[in-house]
Structure formats: C-alpha cells, structure tokens
Amino acid sequence: MQDEAGGDANPIDWRARIVAKLSNTQPRHAVDDWLVPGLSAQDSKHYRSLFPSAPIPAAVLVPLVERPAGLTVLLTQRATQLRNHAGQISFPGGRIEPGDADPKAAALREAHEEIGLDERFIAVIGYLPDHVLISGFRVTPVVSFVQPGFELLLDATEVQDTFEVPLAFVFDPVNHRVRRRRFGFGEAELELCDIPYGNRNIWGATAGMLLTLYRLCVLQESDQ
C-alpha cells in the first residue's frame, strides 16, 4: 500500500479535504514555509536578514483544475525578460493594485491579465498564509478550483508557457527534493525543498506554497 499522498489503495478525495481545510479562511499572517524546517541558528539569522522590513502586498491564484483523472495544479513559466523571478515556475499573480478590493480580486485580475483565465470558470475556496519573498513581496495565495473548458490567452510579455501537474504528484513526498542554494551576498546557503516535474523544476516560493498546502492536507491530517 502506498502512503496517503500516493493513495492507490485508498484514493483520497483531495477536493473534499481542501474544502474542509480552507473553506471560509481569510488572508492571514506571513509564513516562510518554503524553507525546510529545522534551519540552523546561523542559517536562520542570515535568512531573516534578506527580507525587506516593509514588503509589497501581492497575491497569486493557486488554480486547481478539476480534471476527470483528479485535481491538477495550473502553473506558469514566467517570461525570461521579467525583472523579478524571470523564467521561473510560478502561479499567476502580482502586486495588489489600488483598484483591487482585496487579495482575491487582485489574484483573479492577474490571472485574467497574464493567462486569460476567465473568472467564470473559477471558484475561490480560501487562502493559505502569506509568504514573504526575498524579492520584496508579501504574497497571499488564493486557492481555487477551476472547471475544465477554459481557454488560455497568454500575455507573452509576462508568461512564456503554462502546464499542469497532478496534485497527487505534488502531495507525494517521494517527489520532494531538499537542496541548498545561495541567497544574498556572501557564501551562506539555505535549504529549500524543490518539486522536480519532468524537465521543469518547481522551487522557491511556488514550491513553498504547494508544500504549505501539502502539510495542511496531508501531514496535519495524518497527525489527527
């Protein structure tokens, strides 16, 4: 029998579990969940020194597509000419603008602008805790279910490509890879958890948000 995330013997209804965990949640305090727990005191001190004192509010849409074979995560590959996170795997999103009523409105707007995802296909479920990024943003992840049948229209100035990853793959700890990367100035390195998928590598804040969802739906459930 596989572990709970693999779930071949006893398939998990991830949709129902996500609804149970996130329904009616609101944006909340920041976490730095893309780091591997158990960071040394030296690494923790260096890590904290990299963050801005007043990060810019931003939001991303975490789109979970309801495919017949199970939920998938819709991800983007950012355009290579962007100033921040160029070429990286990410969720559609960006800074919260003055005209946005809240993080949800910002995430929906950005998803439409970046990849043409029509709001009519989207049902927002709730929020993961904010993630503070070294690039200077405090990001609110807005988790949603997306009905199939949508057509995407990519803004080539921001998005190079889109693809989907099965949520069961993301939730399988066999696919989580701990790696060390250098951040900021000097020689200090920090441990992060990547999620390689085919010829793509999901890492940094995007992997961190997915791992936050994994811990909420898999690890916390197992502890109960």
What are these regions (language model features)?
Residues L154-G198:
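NUDIX/MutT-family hydrolases
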Residues M1-S90, R95-E113, L117-T140, F145-G149, ...:
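N-terminal leader/linker segments that precede catalytic domains of diphosphate-processing enzymes
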